[in-house]
C-alpha cells in the first residue's frame, strides 16, 4: 500500500510537469507618438518563459471588429489552447502578441485621411517595443502573423506589405476590404475604411484598394517575396465572408503563390476560430523549428 501511495505521488508530479501553464497579461501599454496616446496590448508567455533564459518565436495575433486586445483571451481561449498545443508537442513554445486595434478607431490600415496611421504604429512602434521588452527572436524565420475577420484582413495586409518580416501568415475568416463603393459607405460612420465620410466615391475606392486590398496587393507583389511566406487561409462554409476568401485562394493560385486553403464546416463565430487556432499554431511552428 505504501509503495502504491508513493507511485501515485510520483505520477502526479510527472503529469503536473507535463501540463505546464503559460501566462497571460492583457492590460499592458506603450506610449505611441504616431497614434498620440497610450496603446494597450496583451501577451501570452509560454510555460517555461520565467524559468529559462532562451528567446522565443513570436505570433502576432489580431482581433476582429468590435473586439480589442482581450478578445482572443476572453473568447478565443488562446491561453488554454496554446498551452495544450505546446504540452502535446504540436506547437513550439512561442510568445503571442495581441494588440488593441479598436480604441480610437477600428482597423489595421493607415487612414486615407492621413490622420490615423495604425499600420505605421504596428511596424514602427509596437513590434520594436515588444521584441525588445520580451525575449523574442528578431528575424523573419521566427515571426508569424494571424488574425480573425478584420484581423484576418490585417494579417493578409501586413504579410503582403512586409513579406520580409513574416515566415508565416494565417488569415482566418478574413475581411479583405470593400469590393464596391457602396460597401465602403456601410462602415463610413466608424471610419472603418479610412476616414469619416458619407460620400465615398470611386476615387476613394480605387485609392483604398490600391493600398490595402489583398486581391490587388497579390497582383502587385513580387512572386518570390510572396513565396517566402507560408500561407494558411481558413474560412467556414457558412461564413458570409467565404466568397472573398475563395477569391483570394483563386488569385493566389493564379499568381503561383504557394498556400494552404481550408473551407471547413462553420460560420463567423468564436466556436469556429477556437477550432482553427490549434492548426494555426501547428502550421506556424513548422517554420519555427
Placement of each model-derived feature along the sequence:
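Positively charged n-region of N-terminal signal peptides that target proteins for export
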Residues: 1-6
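A periodicity- and composition-biased signal for non-globular, repetitive helical segments
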Residues: 8-10, 45
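Hydrophobic h-region of N-terminal signal peptides that target proteins for export
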Residues: 10-19
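Non-catalytic cap/lid and distal C-terminal segments of serine-dependent acyl enzymes
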Residues: 20-289
Amino acid at each position: 500500500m505504501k509503495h502504491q501511495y508513493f507511485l501515485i505521488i510520483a505520477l502526479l508530479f510527472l503529469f503536473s510537469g507535463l501540463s505546464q501553464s503559460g501566462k497571460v497579461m492583457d492590460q499592458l501599454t506603450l506610449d505611441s507618438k504616431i497614434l498620440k496616446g497610450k496603446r494597450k496590448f496583451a501577451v501570452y508567455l509560454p510555460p517555461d518563459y520565467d524559468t529559462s533564459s532562451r528567446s522565443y518565436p513570436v505570433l502576432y495575433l489580431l482581433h476582429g471588429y468590435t473586439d480589442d486586445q482581450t478578445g482572443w483571451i476572453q473568447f478565443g481561449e488562446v491561453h488554454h489552447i496554446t498551452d495544450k498545443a505546446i504540452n502535446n508537442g504540436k506547437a513550439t513554445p512561442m510568445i503571442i502578441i495581441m494588440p488593441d486595434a479598436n480604441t480610437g478607431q477600428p482597423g489595421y490600415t493607415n487612414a486615407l485621411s492621413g490622420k490615423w496611421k495604425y499600420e505605421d504604429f504596428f511596424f514602427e512602434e509596437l513590434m520594436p517595443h515588444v521584441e525588445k521588452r520580451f525575449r523574442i527572436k528578431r528575424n523573419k524565420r521566427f515571426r508569424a502573423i494571424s488574425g480573425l475577420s478584420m484581423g484576418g484582413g490585417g494579417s493578409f495586409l501586413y504579410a503582403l506589405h512586409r513579406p520580409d518580416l513574416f515566415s508565416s501568415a494565417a488569415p482566418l475568416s478574413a475581411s479583405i476590404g470593400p469590393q464596391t463603393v457602396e460597401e465602403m459607405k456601410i462602415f463610413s460612420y466608424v471610419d472603418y475604411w479610412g476616414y469619416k465620410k458619407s460620400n465615398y466615391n470611386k476615387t476613394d475606392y480605387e485609392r483604398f484598394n490600391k493600398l490595402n486590398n489583398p486581391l490587388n496587393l497579390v497582383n502587385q507583389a513580387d512572386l518570390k517575396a510572396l513565396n517566402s511566406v507560408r500561407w494558411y487561409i481558413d474560412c467556414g462554409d457558412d461564413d458570409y465572408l467565404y466568397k472573398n476568401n475563395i477569391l483570394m485562394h483563386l488569385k493566389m493560385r493564379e499568381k503561383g503563390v504557394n498556400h494552404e486553403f481550408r473551407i471547413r464546416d462553420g460560420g463567423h463565430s468564436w466556436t469556429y476560430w477556437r477550432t482553427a487556432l490549434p492548426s494555426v499554431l501547428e502550421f506556424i511552428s513548422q517554420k519555427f523549428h
